[in-house]
């Protein structure tokens, strides 16, 4: 029998048989999007985020966690410069390895992981270079179409900027794995939500930075996951990610209409995570204990148990009752006792 839920998590990611199926759910802790971007510059905000995530663990006792990057969303060079034209993307430059965005981030995540006392494993949210620039334009400029204009006008400028960001994200991820105690990163990616941007353009100018980042981090520790984000109904071509160098895959099964079992086959048998719709319309948010536990058992009966982690499609609503997550763990673990 595995020693604890931390070891069970690693065994699950390795696709080994386990005596339990683990479940984990997460939500953001800052409702102010600008604080999610700029919060790292205020130690009081950092301390508050750490305390909230520690309290979440104490209150819910999850089987594993995906630690949120609230307050540290974006690279400083993405935040501090103005980008009127694609030419301005040359302003994106690497930062020192001891920049506060890195050192404060590592210290904050270490404080959260230390709080688990080795009982569970954890991933940490990292936004891909594409996602970072997109969020910068959406959050700080309220211009969600700007990144698509830049990509159409000067794709190589985009690719060059992403390559620089990937280098610093490799530094950050390496320090997090080696110093904070996380098992791996949870890289958030999403394909362009613009029909004018071709798959070939995405593959040539966006994808390389993501593959470079993941390949380097996998060399540090082989337990990293990719999150193919379907937040608010965004669709992705899941098969385009099947050759990414990662241990496990997570996608919005309700949005993409691809079950865990189907995804596991698509991704050549690697570990997968998901199962529950994460919106206010889903059973996880509004269901009774009986309904949530019935859905948990259905998910495992239809998708199998080996190499599977149960979670939401993405972040759950702020006001979700933490008891709901405990109900899933109870049903998932109870279903496997003695099997």
Would you name each region that the model predicts?
Residues 1-30, 37-40, 52, 63-67, ...:
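Active-site loop segments of alpha/beta catalytic cores
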Residues 28-32, 71-74:
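Short active-site-proximal "capping" loops at secondary-structure junctions
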Residues 32-43, 48-49, 86-97:
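Glycine-/proline-rich flexible loop or hinge segments
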Residues 50-74:
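Membrane helical hairpin/interfacial module
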Residues 67-98, 111-114, 119:
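A contiguous, low-structure linker/loop signature
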């Amino acid at each position: 029998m595995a020693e604890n839920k931390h070891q069970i998590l690693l065994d699950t990611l390795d696709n080994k048989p386990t005596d339990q199926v683990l479940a984990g759910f997460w939500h953001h802790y800052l409702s102010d999007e600008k604080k999610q971007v700029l919060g790292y510059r205020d130690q009081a905000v950092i301390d508050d985020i750490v305390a909230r995530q520690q309290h979440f663990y104490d209150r819910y006792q999850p089987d594993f966690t995906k630690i949120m990057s609230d307050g540290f969303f974006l690279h400083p060079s993405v935040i501090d410069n103005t980008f009127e034209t694609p030419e301005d993307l040359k302003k994106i430059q690497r930062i020192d390895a001891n920049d506060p965005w890195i050192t404060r981030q590592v210290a904050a995540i270490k404080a959260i992981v230390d709080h688990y006392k080795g009982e569970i494993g954890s991933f940490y949210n990292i936004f891909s270079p594409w996602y970072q620039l997109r969020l910068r334009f959406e959050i700080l400029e309220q211009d969600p179409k700007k990144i698509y204009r830049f990509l159409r006008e000067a794709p190589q400028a985009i690719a060059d900027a992403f390559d620089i960001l990937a280098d610093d994200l490799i530094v950050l991820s390496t320090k997090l794995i080696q110093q904070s105690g996380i098992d791996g990163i949870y890289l958030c990616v999403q394909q362009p939500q613009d029909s004018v941007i071709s798959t070939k353009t995405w593959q040539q100018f966006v994808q390389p930075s993501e593959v470079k980042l993941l390949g380097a981090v996998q060399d540090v520790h082989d337990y990293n996951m990719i999150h193919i984000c379907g937040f608010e109904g965004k669709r992705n071509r899941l098969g385009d990610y099947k050759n990414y160098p990662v241990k496990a895959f997570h996608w919005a099964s309700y949005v993409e209409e691809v079950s865990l079992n189907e995804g596991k086959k698509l991704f050549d048998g690697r570990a997968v995570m998901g199962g529950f719709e994460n919106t206010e319309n889903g059973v996880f948010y509004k269901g009774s204990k009986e309904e949530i536990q019935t859905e948990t058992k259905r998910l495992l009966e239809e998708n199998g148990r080996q190499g599977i982690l149960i979670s939401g499609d993405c972040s759950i609503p702020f006001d979700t009752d933490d008891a709901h997550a405990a109900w899933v763990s109870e049903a998932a673990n109870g279903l496997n006792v003695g099997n």
